[in-house]
UniProtKB/Swiss-Prot annotation:
Specifically methylates the N7 position of a guanine in 16S rRNA. Signal peptide: none annotated. GO terms for cellular component: cytosol. The keyword rRNA processing applies. InterPro entries: rRNA_ssu_MeTfrase_G, SAM-dependent_MTases_sf. It comes from Alkaliphilus oremlandii (strain OhILAs). This is Ribosomal RNA small subunit methyltransferase G. PANTHER family: S-ADENOSYL-L-METHIONINE-DEPENDENT METHYLTRANSFERASES SUPERFAMILY PROTEIN (PTHR31760:SF0). CDD domains: AdoMet_MTases.
Amino acid sequence: MELKDILKEGAQGLNIEITDAQINQLIKYKDILLEWNQKMNLTAIEEEKDVMIKHFLDSLSCIQSKYLKREGKMIDVGTGAGFPGVPLKIALPGIELTLLDSLRKRISFLEEVCAETKLGQVDFVHGRAEDIGQSKDYREKYDYAVSRAVAALNVLVEYCLPFVKVGGYFICQKGPQIIEELPDAEKAIKVLGGEVVEQISVDLPFSDITHHILVIKKIKQTPSKYPRKAGKPSKEPIK
């Protein structure tokens, strides 16, 4: 099966509309990703077909949330190689996207991806979530925070919820372990001003992978002491 067919049929399987032009943007993204991956560690997934499924379709599955609209301000926290933020921006061009990562080289890669795929309204921020989340330029400025980061949920919410404005949403992608992590994260979610409003189980097309999407609504402001200093959330999670 051709790569464009994997994307087209996979998107249909997820009930997501995607145009030929958007498919071409994603394929261009894949080319740049695999080229840069030769010189720096961006992804362990190197087969073209797997990039389509495990990176692109997985990222696009966030669109299954009834709370994610076609426009608004979004920040991808700890974006790494751009997932899920860049595929979401390609599929939802009305989104204003901020990509946050702590590694300068990854930001340089993302700048090239967005230039080559002609993505506008993208802001690149080099820094740690704990520091940027305390900046008045970014704190509680976003309709959506998204993350596919590997931290435990009670840590991830401290990284992400401070960026979300009251009435906005944190859309978190995790594996099956999210079911076990949720009870441990309930206090952190509440303390940081959030409330779980949606849980979705996603069977990823062309794979045997099941992922989960957790949507947390920001119902009140995050107390000013959060996020705590860099390293503190992961060493001493809110419990």
